A protein has these predicted regions:
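N-terminal secretory signal peptides and thylakoid transit peptides that target proteins
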Residues: 1-22
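C-terminal segment of N-terminal export signals and the immediately downstream linker at the start
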Residues: 5, 23-64
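Alpha-helical structural elements of signaling/regulatory helical domains
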Residues: 49, 67, 85-88
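Mature-region segments of soluble proteins
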Residues: 56, 74-178
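Short acidic alpha-helical/loop segments enriched in Asp/Glu that coordinate divalent cations
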Residues: 67-75
């Protein structure tokens, strides 16, 4: 048998093996877990229930379906860091989660979306809610994370590149060209 070139039989064998290999690899992708949903959060001051409630609370205040909980967990880790050094702050968070759970005498995490929203609405003016809301958008919050910037197409602060005057402010790609 000649090894020069590729005949019809060799082509069919090679392409069918490649197709079978692609099918196996493609089906394995459905089995592998989504890395955006695999996350771990370490807290030292806040207990697990309080921390998980705060993650879901941050998501409820600033919902983005395409963002995984890992981005919201970073906010809770920052809340925990502040709670380590400020006992009054830790008390506000723990009592706030307890008050949120007490609205319907059921853990807030177990409520349906409508009841969760109603419970949050009833607590909007409390220091607890305002603290969590402020931390969620503050200097260590959701929109300060470079990976979140990438998700929304934000290139980051312009001052690092000389500001908008020397860099140009019309270099965005999402506006239609006229």
């Amino acid at each position: 048998m000649s090894t020069k070139g590729m005949n019809r039989r060799r082509f069919l064998q090679t392409s069918s093996l490649a197709l079978a290999g692609a099918a196996v690899v493609g089906s394995m992708g459905a089995i592998l877990p989504d890395p955006t949903n695999a996350w771990a959060m370490s807290t030292t001051t806040l207990d697990a229930h309080t921390a998980l409630t705060l993650v879901k609370l941050c998501r409820a205040i600033y919902p983005h379906d395409a963002l995984g909980d890992t981005y919201y967990a970073k906010i809770v880790e920052e809340l925990d860091k502040k709670a380590q050094t400020d006992p009054d702050f830790a008390r506000v968070l723990q009592e706030g989660v307890a008050a949120l759970d007490a609205v319907y005498h059921v853990q807030w995490l177990d409520l349906s979306e409508g009841y969760k929203r109603h419970a949050l609405k009833s607590m909007e003016s409390t220091p607890f809610f305002q603290t969590v809301r402020g931390f969620s958008i503050g200097s260590t919050g959701l929109y300060s994370q470079p990976l979140v910037w990438r998700h929304f197409g934000y290139e980051g602060p312009s001052w690092r590149f000389g500001g908008y005057l020397t860099r140009g402010f019309d270099d965005i790609g999402w506006l239609p060209e006229d």
